[in-house]
């Protein structure tokens, strides 16, 4: 079992500011500044302890505000498309979806927008930390986890954006994003941490290939997402 423990060491004589660290990380993941014009499709296989295998195809065109999610779970397949202000849903090839199916599979436009934001955020890191409403603690932290030292940024958000507290862990040599964790209430040690392994380049962006999820509270393994193109 992976044990997520470590020591937070504020760097009083900082080698670089939090802003400089983020710049270095973005330079690593998006060396040619392609993210704002990102246009590509990729696949995510989600393996969960308590749920059946879920395979998703995600298409993003950030410049055109286009998002498409096609999901396969067992014998069922559904799609959600957001094209600017328009939303379209289908289930097993039909757009005529019963209320029962909508409720069972949580198939609605609000959910589609949530998934758009979810995939754009997680696969757009660390570039998404430049978004409006993001509050980056100016103090760079050094943290030792499982014998490895990381540079760490603490991030919170304006109330209208989000209420969670996030920590992002960067490789001390390459500045690659290696793990992150979030808390709903840090005093309760709730929330989850995510370990990133390997990389895959999608449309010029270095994205994590494997993401493994664990509870902060007891290191319980929750599942794994595997990226492919």
Language-model segment annotations:
Residues 27-95, 133-141:
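N-terminal mature ectodomain segment of secretory-pathway/periplasmic proteins
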Residues 48-55, 73-80, 94-99, 160-165, ...:
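Short, surface-exposed beta-strand/loop "edge" segments at domain boundaries and coil↔beta transitions
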Residues 1-18:
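Bacterial Sec-dependent N-terminal signal peptides
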Residues 14-20, 89-164, 187-190:
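Flexible, processing/modification-adjacent segments and terminal tails
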Residues 144-229:
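Gly/Pro-enriched, hydrophobic low-complexity segments
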Residues 58-65, 83-86, 102-106, 198-200, ...:
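A short, sequence-level motif marking secondary-structure junctions
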């Amino acid at each position: 079992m992976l044990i997520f423990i470590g020591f937070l060491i504020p760097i009083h004589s900082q080698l670089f500011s939090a802003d400089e660290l983020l710049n270095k990380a973005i330079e690593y993941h998006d060396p040619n500044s392609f993210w704002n014009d990102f246009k590509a499709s990729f696949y995510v296989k989600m393996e969960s302890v308590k749920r059946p295998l879920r395979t998703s195809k995600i298409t993003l065109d950030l410049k055109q505000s286009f998002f498409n999610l096609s999901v396969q779970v067992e014998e069922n397949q559904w799609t959600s498309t957001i094209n600017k202000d328009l939303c379209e849903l289908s289930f097993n090839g039909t757009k005529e979806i019963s209320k029962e199916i909508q409720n069972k599979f949580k198939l609605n436009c609000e959910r589609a927008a949530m998934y758009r934001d979810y995939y754009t955020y997680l696969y757009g890191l660390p570039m998404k930390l430049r978004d409006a409403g993001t509050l980056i603690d100016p103090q760079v932290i050094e943290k030792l986890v499982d014998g490895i030292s990381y540079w760490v940024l603490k991030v919170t958000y304006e109330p209208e954006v989000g209420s969670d507290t996030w920590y992002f862990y960067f490789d001390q040599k390459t500045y690659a994003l290696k793990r992150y964790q979030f808390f709903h209430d840090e005093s309760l040690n709730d929330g989850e941490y995510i370990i990133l392994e390997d990389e895959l380049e999608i449309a010029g962006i270095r994205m994590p290939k494997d993401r493994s999820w664990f509870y902060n509270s007891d290191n319980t393994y929750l599942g794994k997402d595997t990226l492919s193109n």
